[in-house]
């Protein structure tokens, strides 16, 4: 197997390939152009999107040429893959703004200065003539075959709109256009994209005669059953305005022990020998590996300086010392404080809990601290006098901490 593919396989990235042997031979012979696509369905990507872009970084390190494809066009349709119901149709203005923010996020992670492209499929999809598209592209698609793919089989029971049914044709056309424009030979995506990717490979092969390939990656899950990319605060976004760098660091710092080695392989560039060494211990000794994991992935997404700040803040929060300023904070407006504010109301306002009942349960269980002092009264109130130097420290359990600032 080709060296680049061996690296991906060893680190747990490979799931399915349209023809692994032929792809390996091609990659031994030349540096290929490959692409990863992502739709602009929200203002930020989350860590569930990171896996294909980690693969992109690995292949780029081996000299292969990446294309980041942002789905400014396909987002107008909505991918039914992995969805139980039709996606909400977004306004064009919202899609355009999402394209800008997602592009900015990815360019902080993927350096294209030495080769590579970032493209928006709206460039060729927005101007399509529907009749011509059906004649030039639709002719290569079998409805029977499309319905055999799991994406469509699942949705047929609950309803599949015609607009979503067109999505596979558009994604396949993307591959055809990238093959024609940039000599792209490989599409990479999550395993839920297998049907779309196979259809794209087939379209390129039949319409242009070019030999291209598709590669899918496993959908990553956590050993505790929680969905990858979800936390108590919701999605773990890559945008620091939506999910702080500190919380991003802490998400990886606090993963289950059983996931440490797997995530070190997936989310860092550490060598195999080092991963095996630091992940071979158990219990409290594994905390060092978790800190390394958290630092490395935070460095990839947010940069080394921000990773250092997050690491320093985490140590300051739980051991005392410098770094307090890097702990996330919530700005409490004086109008909310008035004479005083109930702690349970403050916890909801600061979004550390989702409801007052959850706040009360945490207080009753002894898991809430104000300036390192446990609070045992559900009716505990805070007033201006509590905010020494204009702030207090709110701690929930051992792992969640927030500065409340006036």
Swiss-Prot record:
Gene Ontology MF terms: ATP binding; RNA binding; tyrosine-tRNA ligase activity
Keyword Transcription regulation recorded: no
Top EC class, one word: ligase
Keyword Coiled coil: no
Residues the entry annotates as binding L-tyrosine: 35, 167, 171
EC number: 6.1.1.1
Motif ('HIGH' region): 40-49
Motif 'KMSKS' region, chain ranges: 227-231
The S4 RNA-binding domain, residue ranges: 341-405
Cell compartments where the protein resides: Cytoplasm
A Pfam short name: SYY_C-terminal
Keyword entries, A-Z: Aminoacyl-tRNA synthetase, ATP-binding, Cytoplasm, Ligase, Nucleotide-binding, Protein biosynthesis, RNA-binding
SUPFAM superfamilies: Alpha-L RNA-binding motif, Nucleotidylyl transferase
A single Gene Ontology CC term: cytosol
Sequence similarity: Belongs to the class-I aminoacyl-tRNA synthetase family. TyrS type 1 subfamily.
NCBIfam families given in the database record: tyrS
Subunit comment: Homodimer.
Its biological purpose: Catalyzes the attachment of tyrosine to tRNA(Tyr) in a two-step reaction: tyrosine is first activated by ATP to form Tyr-AMP and then transferred to the acceptor end of tRNA(Tyr).
HAMAP family xrefs: Tyr_tRNA_synth_type1
Protein name: Tyrosine--tRNA ligase
Origin species: Borrelia recurrentis (strain A1)
């Amino acid at each position: 197997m080709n060296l680049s593919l061996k690296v991906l396989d060893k680190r747990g990235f490979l799931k399915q390939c349209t023809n692994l042997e032929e792809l390996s031979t091609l990659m031994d012979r030349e540096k290929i152009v490959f692409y990863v696509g992502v739709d602009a369905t929200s203002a930020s990507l989350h860590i569930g999107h990171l896996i294909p872009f980690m693969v992109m970084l690995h292949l780029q390190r081996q000299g292969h040429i990446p294309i980041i494809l942002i789905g400014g066009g396909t987002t107008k349709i909505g991918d039914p893959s992995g969805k139980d119901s039709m996606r909400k149709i977004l306004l064009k203005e919202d899609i355009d703004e999402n394209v800008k923010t997602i592009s900015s996020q990815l360019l902080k992670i993927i350096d294209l200065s030495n080769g590579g492209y970032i493209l928006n499929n709206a460039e060729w999809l927005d101007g399509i003539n529907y009749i011509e598209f059906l004649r030039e592209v639709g002719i290569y698609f079998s409805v029977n075959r499309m319905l055999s793919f799991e994406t469509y089989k699942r949705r047929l029971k609950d309803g599949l709109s015609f607009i979503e049914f067109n999505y596979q044709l558009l994604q396949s056309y993307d591959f055809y256009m990238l093959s024609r424009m940039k000599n792209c030979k490989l599409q990479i995506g999550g395993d839920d994209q297998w049907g779309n990717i196979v259809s794209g490979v087939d379209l390129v092969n039949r319409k242009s005669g070019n030999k291209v390939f598709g590669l899918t990656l496993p959908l990553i899950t956590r050993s505790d059953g929680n969905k990858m990319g979800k936390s108590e605060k919701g999605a773990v976004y890559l945008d620091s305005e939506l999910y702080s760098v500190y919380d991003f660091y802490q998400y990886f710092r606090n993963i289950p022990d059983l996931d440490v080695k797997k995530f070190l392989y997936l989310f860092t560039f550490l060598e195999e020998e080092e991963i095996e060494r630091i992940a071979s211990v158990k219990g409290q000794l594994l905390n060092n590996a978790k800190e390394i994991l958290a630092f490395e992935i935070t460095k990839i997404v947010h940069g080394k300086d921000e990773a250092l700040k997050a690491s320093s803040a985490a140590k300051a929060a739980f051991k005392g010392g410098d770094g307090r300023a890097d702990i996330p904070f919530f700005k409490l407006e004086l109008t909310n404080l008035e004479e005083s504010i109930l702690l349970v109301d403050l916890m909801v306002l600061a979004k550390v809990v989702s409801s007052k009942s959850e706040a009360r349960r945490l207080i009753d269980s002894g898991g809430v601290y104000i300036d390192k002092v446990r609070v045992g009264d559900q009716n505990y109130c805070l007033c201006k006098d509590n905010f020494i130097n204009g702030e207090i420290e709110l701690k929930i359990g051992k792992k969640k901490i927030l500065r409340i600032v006036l």
